[in-house]
């Protein structure tokens, strides 16, 4: 998770010649609580304002080309290659350098008018406000408001459904798959008006480098999982051989490759069951079921077939799950791909190029 944290006044003022324009012990206490034990990155000027001394009990990194007694990185890209989870603490140029990859912003707005010459760039446009908490003035600190923003992951085309960006942010972590930007890939690649087929999976692959945000799909070059191997085997028997195990080309043609749970912890299958995904995915299924165009829902196995009650208006194609435990009990020989194309053609829709 890439987070930026700062305090500002109502006009966006954050600094005055290298110092804070205010003294607010309550906000400094919150900053300490949020950053202790974490990796923090700052610009050279911010580090200089600290007397070139790292903040204690935090892993300090400075964005600079200069040689220092602490770890340095030359670019945001280098920082992201080294760390998955860090907090950007300033200054203005450093915030701007990380703007396009920020996933969360924690902003304290200090009440009052202050003198200064450094303003925070606009970092939160396009983000969603997650929370806003007001704190009254105390004996030592002016009143302040703490606002939490998080990245908006939901594609504009799907804006009529509940936005799950907060859930993505809450569940994200270095050992959670897929990465936040990939969690909604099924929706990123397939707009509502383009949906022709829905293939329901269960949860993402829990092995590093495999989860793509598309049910059953993995990047080329990875070892083929058993269920995908059986899907490709049935495809070859039904229509022909497919070289790629990356199913993105299906998604781009209108095949919504949707899992019923969209994130997972490394090495722990089904670990994010009952974490909040089920209501969201049920809403997506119901929304797609009410789209005007012909759509075919493909339900392989009991887990997917448990969602059949949500499908009231579209055609449903059912079979056993392609897992090695059940593929010989009603998946192999069902010819789903040619059947789907025949159903699409009969409905006046363009068939899918499965190969």
Model segments located where?
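Short glycine-rich loop/turn motifs that provide flexible caps or phosphate-binding loops at active sites
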Residues: 11-14, 42, 89-90, 115, ...
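Enzymes that bind and transform nitrogen-containing heteroaromatic metabolites
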Residues: 1-152
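Residues that form or immediately flank small-molecule/cofactor binding pockets and catalytic motifs
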Residues: 9, 65, 77, 110, ...
